[in-house]
Amino acid sequence: MRGASHLQILLLLVLGTRMQECAACGQPRMSSRIVGGRDAQDGEWPWQTSIQHRGAHVCGGSLIAPQWVLTAGHCFPRRVWPSEYSVLLGALSLDVRSSHELLVPVLRVLLPPDYSEDEARGDLALLQLRHPVSLSTRIQPVCLPAPGSHPPPGSPCWVTGWGSLSPGVPLPKGRPLQGVRVPLLDSRACDRLYHVGANVPQGERIVLPGNLCAGYRRGHKDACQGDSGGPLTCMESGHWVLVGVVSWGKGCALPNRPGVYTNVAKYSPWIQARLSL
């Protein structure tokens, strides 16, 4: 009986730890009220990061663990030197420094085994930071989706980043973090939209099964240049979940050309395996 009691206590401790780990992600202190194309509030998207090459912003990213950031593979050249990259965390504006910010060097850049920049396949990159970061109200990880999970089409999600407002139109002075609410689209329906006006046979996929889409058929709201690698997050059971990573699109917010994202749930097993090494 004593052995059984110890086992029960151990199980409760393990389950409690896992529940704490779950509760520690995807729950910013500031609730989101961004509906479309407005400045983010301080602490609203605490997992948002800026991937920087020699001090210049190149892509967005998401903190998924104290020492790991998820972004897009195409943000890096075929031969990458991690020492040239760093990750900015806790920032609300790229041009206005804050005492809450952290700039951490990148130790390693890991790509999925099926990554292909030419085919926009497996467009993810895991960045291991040189050291774990201390979490705060402005620096928090986002939750990863369960492997193979599929949020229903129409789910309201948010894409955030420091990208251009439209092609050739940069952010205003200070470069504040932006966010826009976009609905999820079925990947096959999205593929049909991309065939409209395209000289591509209907049987040939443009949007691959490993992708998902978000946006409006009429356009108007979308990610843009500089948002690549950034998060597409959806609220699930009271937690923000990293459903997609900004991958590619035709222009920005054009009709029949919604934003295309890498489906994070498809790569959750690979991500979790890397994090546990």
UniProtKB/Swiss-Prot annotation:
Tissue expression profile of the protein: Widely expressed.
Entry's Gene Ontology molecular function annotations: serine-type endopeptidase activity; serine-type peptidase activity
Reported modifications of this chain: Not glycosylated.
InterPro entries: Peptidase_S1_PA (IPR009003), Peptidase_S1_PA_chymotrypsin (IPR043504), Peptidase_S1A (IPR001314), Trypsin_dom (IPR001254), TRYPSIN_HIS (IPR018114), TRYPSIN_SER (IPR033116)
Leader sequence segment: 1-24
Disulfide bridge partners, by residue number: 59-75, 157-234, 190-213, 224-252
Domain of life, source organism: Eukaryota
Active site: 74 (charge relay system), 123 (charge relay system), 228 (charge relay system)
Alphabetized PROSITE patterns for the sequence: TRYPSIN_DOM (PS50240), TRYPSIN_HIS (PS00134), TRYPSIN_SER (PS00135)
Compartment(s) where it occurs, according to its Swiss-Prot or TrEMBL record: Secreted
Main subcellular localisation: secreted
Protein EC: 3.4.21.-
Protein name according to UniProt: Serine protease 33
Organism of origin: Mus musculus
